A protein has these predicted regions:
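Contiguous, well-folded functional domains in the mature portion of proteins
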Residues: 1-416
Length: 416
C-alpha cells in the first residue's frame, strides 16, 4: 500500500432545490415544542444555561442565550441562522457549540432526547448538510485557502489537491468538497519500520492520546467492572457501550483516541493488515458533553442526582459510530471505532463485509463535523506507542500525528 487512493468529491447541489423544504421543516419546530413538557424544558434549559454566567468559561455562552430567555429571539430563528451557516476559520463550529452547551443542561438533555424533538433535529442536520454540500456554501473558502491553522493545529492547503489551484476558492464547488479534499500524491507515505508485521500505523490525522495504557487486573470480574478514567478529568469512557458485543475482549488493553480537528484530513485508513470479521453502524445522539465540568469548582454546574453526566467522553459511546473488528495474525482482534461529533451527518464506510484490508488502506471518511478514531487492543499484548520521538501520553497532552505514519509496535517477549 504505497499511495493513498483519492475519492471522488461529492457533486454539489443547487440550494434552491432544498431551501423551501428546509425552511418548512424549521417551521414545524413550533408543533414539536407543543408536545408535553418540550417548551417548558426548553425554557428551563435556557434558565440553567444563563444561570452559569458566574462560571468564567461559560459567561460568553450564557450571554449568547440570554436574548432567547428574554423572548427577544426564538429557537426557530436560531435554527434558521444555523441552517445556512458556512464554517469560518475563526468559528468553524459556531452554532453546534452553543447548541451543545444548551442541550447538555439537565432540561436540555431531556428535550434533545424527546421522541418528537430528536427526529426533528436529525432531519434539520441533514438539511444543514445539504447546505454545506451546495454551491451556495463557498463564501468562506477564500479564507480557508489562506488559513495556516493554529499553533496546536497547523494547516497547509499545499498538502492537498485543489480542482483549480489558481482560484481564490481552490476551485472547490461547495464547502463539503473542501472538507473532503484529497491529499496530493506522495503525501503521507506509509511507515516503513521493520518488522512490518509488528507495526501499527496511524489511522488518521489528529492528536493522539491514551484513554488507557493497559493495566488489566488478573481477576476477570475486576476487569469487567473497570471504567476508563481520563487523567486530570472527571470523565469516563465506557468501552462496553461504545463497542457492543466485542467490548469485553478489549477491556484492560491499551486504548487510544485520535481527535480530528476541522482542518485535518478527514479520511481514515487501516491501522493494521487483516480480515474485517465484523463491521456496522451504530446510531447515537447528535450531541455530546463538553469536558469543562470541574467538581472542585464552587461555581461549577450541579449534576442531577440521577445523572452520569460528567463530560463529553462519558457520552462517547452514545454518538453515531462505525465499528470495524479486524482479525490479525500478530495482534489478535483489533477494534477501530469511527465516532462522529459536532453534528457529523455521515460516516462513510468503503470496506465490504468479510474483506481483507491492507495496512494504510483507505477505509472511509467523515462528513463535515468533529470526529474521533478510537483504537482498542487486547490486554495480553505488549505494545509501545510513540509519534516520531514523542511518546503517546494522556488526554491532557495529545501528540499531533499524520495518517499512515508509524504509531505503535508489538514488543518481543523478554527472554535470556
Amino acid at each position: 500500500m504505497s499511495e493513498i487512493t483519492s475519492i471522488t468529491l461529492p457533486v454539489p447541489i443547487d440550494w434552491s432545490t432544498k431551501s423551501k423544504a428546509a425552511e418548512e421543516h424549521i417551521k414545524k419546530l413550533k408543533d414539536v415544542l407543543k408536545h408535553p413538557h418540550n417548551e417548558s424544558n426548553y425554557i428551563s434549559a435556557l434558565v440553567e444555561e444563563c444561570a452559569e454566567e458566574l462560571i468564567p468559561n461559560r459567561k460568553q455562552v450564557a450571554s449568547y442565550w440570554e436574548p432567547y430567555l428574554m423572548g427577544e429571539l426564538t429557537l426557530e430563528s436560531f435554527f434558521l441562522e444555523w441552517l445556512t451557516y458556512t464554517p469560518t476559520t475563526l468559528s468553524p463550529g459556531k452554532y453546534i457549540e452553543y447548541w451543545d452547551y444548551l442541550v447538555n443542561t439537565q432540561s436540555g438533555l431531556i428535550l434533545s432526547n424527546d421522541a418528537y424533538f430528536k427526529p426533528w433535529f436529525k432531519d434539520f442536520l441533514n438539511f444543514h448538510g445539504d447546505w454545506i454540500n451546495s454551491t451556495s456554501s463557498t463564501a468562506t473558502l477564500a479564507d480557508w485557502m489562506k488559513f495556516g491553522g493554529t499553533k496546536a493545529h497547523p494547516f497547509n492547503i499545499e498538502d492537498y489537491e485543489r480542482p483549480d489551484p489558481t482560484s481564490s476558492t481552490g476551485g472547490f464547488k461547495s464547502f463539503n468538497q473542501f472538507f473532503l479534499r484529497n491529499l496530493k500524491p506522495g503525501q503521507r507515505p506509509i511507515c516503513n519500520a521493520e518488522p512490518a508485521d509488528d507495526v501499527i500505523v496511524a489511522p488518521c490525522d489528529g492528536g493522539v492520546f491514551y484513554l488507557d495504557r493497559g493495566s488489566a487486573p488478573g481477576n476477570t470480574e475486576e476487569v469487567l467492572s473497570r471504567d476508563y478514567d481520563l487523567p486530570g478529568k472527571s470523565d469516563r469512557f465506557d468501552l462496553l457501550e461504545a463497542l457492543p458485543g466485542y467490548g469485553p475482549y478489549f477491556l484492560g488493553g491499551q486504548l487510544l483516541d485520535i481527535l480530528l480537528w476541522f482542518t485535518d484530513y478527514h479520511h481514515f485508513h487501516a491501522p493494521v493488515t487483516g480480515e474485517v470479521i465484523h463491521q456496522g453502524l451504530y446510531e447515537g445522539s447528535y450531541n455530546y458533553d463538553f469536558g469543562d465540568y470541574n467538581p472542585e469548582d464552587f461555581y461549577a454546574p450541579k449534576l442531577p442526582s440521577d445523572s452520569d453526566k460528567v463530560g463529553w467522553y462519558d457520552k462517547l459511546g452514545k454518538h453515531q459510530r462505525y465499528v470495524w473488528i479486524i482479525k490479525t495474525e500478530r495482534f489478535g482482534l483489533v477494534a477501530m471505532i469511527a465516532i462522529g461529533f459536532w453534528g457529523v451527518g455521515s460516516i462513510v464506510n468503503a470496506i465490504k463485509d468479510k474483506s481483507k484490508v491492507e495496512k494504510g488502506q483507505y477505509m472511509g471518511h467523515f462528513g463535515y463535523g468533529g470526529s474521533s478514531i478510537v483504537l482498542a487492543f487486547k490486554p495480553s499484548l505488549d505494545l509501545q506507542f510513540k509519534v516520531g520521538e514523542k511518546p503517546v501520553e494522556g488526554p491532557d497532552k495529545p501528540v499531533l500525528m499524520e495518517v499512515r505514519k508509524c504509531l505503535g509496535k508489538r514488543m518481543k517477549p523478554f527472554s535470556w
